[in-house]
Amino acid sequence: MDTALRRIDELTAEIQPLRGQLINFARRQRGCQALQRHYGIGWLCAVIIWAEIGDARRFSSSYQLVRFAGLDITVYSSDSKRSPGHLSHQGSPELRWAAFEAAKSAARRSSPDCGYYHKLAAKHDGHNGKNPTLAVERKILRRCYHTLRELGDAALALPDPRPQQVAA
């Protein structure tokens, strides 16, 4: 037990400087700043989404980003039968995690997506009725796509080199 607690303390000591660097990066990089303006996206989700999407202009539409994240539904079809499958789960699991974390905040009353989330949750037909969080995840990724695409080159620019103080 003491060994495990010591290891946790060692890892915490290693994590704290990295946490500070990521927070500084998120505060100074324009793409991350823009992503953090969306409800539910904090500094960690912003950095992950920014890093995983990269240049949003490489996607011709927001749907391609949703497919890239693996949040699209596969379809099985044979002859005249066509049945919806499951999530493709192709792409980055980190991007899916960040989108999920941001989407879970949509159930809160202060969220701009609260009405959308609860409307889907009340609906019992179709896939969205089963998982309104998935629909909100897609919606958030589409917003992120448009935000980064509008920024253009500024979304990818290196952050301001002046470091800011971060409260631990």
Give the residues covered by each predicted segment.
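A detector of single, family-specific signature residues
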Residues: 1-168
